[in-house]
From Swiss-Prot:
Alternates between an inactive form bound to GDP and an active form bound to GTP. Activated by a guanine nucleotide-exchange factor (GEF) and inactivated by a GTPase-activating protein (GAP). A lipid is attached at C245 (S-farnesyl cysteine). Belongs to the small GTPase superfamily. Ras family. One of its GO terms (cellular component) is membrane. It is a lipid-anchor. Residues 246-248 form a propeptide. The lineage of its organism: Viruses, Riboviria, Pararnavirae, Artverviricota, Revtraviricetes. SMART domains: RAB, RAS, RHO. The keyword Membrane applies. One of its GO terms (molecular function) is G protein activity. The modification Cysteine methyl ester is found at C245. It is found in: Host cell membrane. This is Transforming protein p29. One of its GO terms (biological process) is signal transduction.
Length: 248
């Protein structure tokens, strides 16, 4: 406890940057096999049965995820917790960081390409660019910060504008659920998510509950979005209505 009072700020920031860099390095070291993006299968090298060649590596689907939210809500901490199973509580404002992690979700081997974005208002002009490339979005607020919850509407509207669509895969994430003090109640967040037609998940980047669930749920939302585009509902039929399951 005494150490936290005497450790120079420069050292804590250096520690944060070291952990972040190691998480980046770890993501870069992922074995580079064939990828399929947006449902397109990449060709495997070496045909089946070719003499002296190993069997082709199964193609992975790449998902481009973007983490958005106000400054200080724990976007970087969530991402590093997923990538490296490590929590860093020193705050070092992010401009833009990219991470990659290979995972298996519902039996499918996936490569998550995660963009951790700036929450500071002075970088708002950069948002359009990374929103164009993202397939799905984690919209993060802190449950002890009412303003960050109110800001979610702004991020969602910007995403819809940039993507020129009302149907964009998103997950609402209430971070810092390990804290005793809540200024945003679970029911408020659930009601907001329900009005948007998206899942809501509470997370703690510090103690890890909900972290994998948040990212994996977003991947599932992207999959469902692709299926809807391939098989659009027949809106001419009687009683047809669009709906989306909301997790709470």
């Amino acid at each position: 406890m005494g150490q936290s009072l005497t450790t120079p700020l420069s050292l804590t920031l250096d520690h944060w940057k070291d952990v972040r860099d190691r998480a980046r390095d770890q993501s870069v070291e992922i074995k580079k096999g064939p990828l399929r993006r947006s449902g397109t299968v990449a060709p495997a090298s070496g045909g089946a049965g070719a003499p002296g060649l190993a069997a082709p590596v199964e193609a992975m689907t790449e998902y481009k995820l973007v983490v958005v939210g106000a400054r200080g809500v724990g976007k970087s901490a969530l991402t590093i917790q997923l990538i490296q199973n490590h929590f860093v509580d020193e705050y070092d404002p992010t401009i833009e960081d990219s991470y990659r992690k290979q995972v298996v979700i519902d039996g499918e081997t996936c490569l998550l390409d995660i963009l951790d974005t700036a929450g500071q208002e002075e970088y708002s002009a950069m948002r359009d660019q990374y929103m164009r490339t993202g397939e799905g979005f984690l919209c993060v607020f802190a449950i002890n910060n009412t303003k960050s919850f109110e800001d979610i509407h702004q991020y969602r509207e910007q995403i819809k504008r940039v993507k020129d669509s009302d149907d964009v895969p998103m997950v609402l994430v209430g971070n810092k659920c390990d804290l005793a003090a809540h200024t945003v109640e679970s029911r408020q967040a659930q009601d907001l998510a329900r009005s948007y037609g998206i899942p809501y998940i509470e997370t703690s980047a510090k103690t890890r509950p909900g972290v994998e669930d948040a990212f994996y749920t977003l991947v599932r939302e992207i999959r469902q979005h692709k299926l809807r585009k391939l098989n659009p509902p027949d809106e001419s039929g009687p009683g047809c209505m669009s709906c989306k399951c909301v997790l709470s």
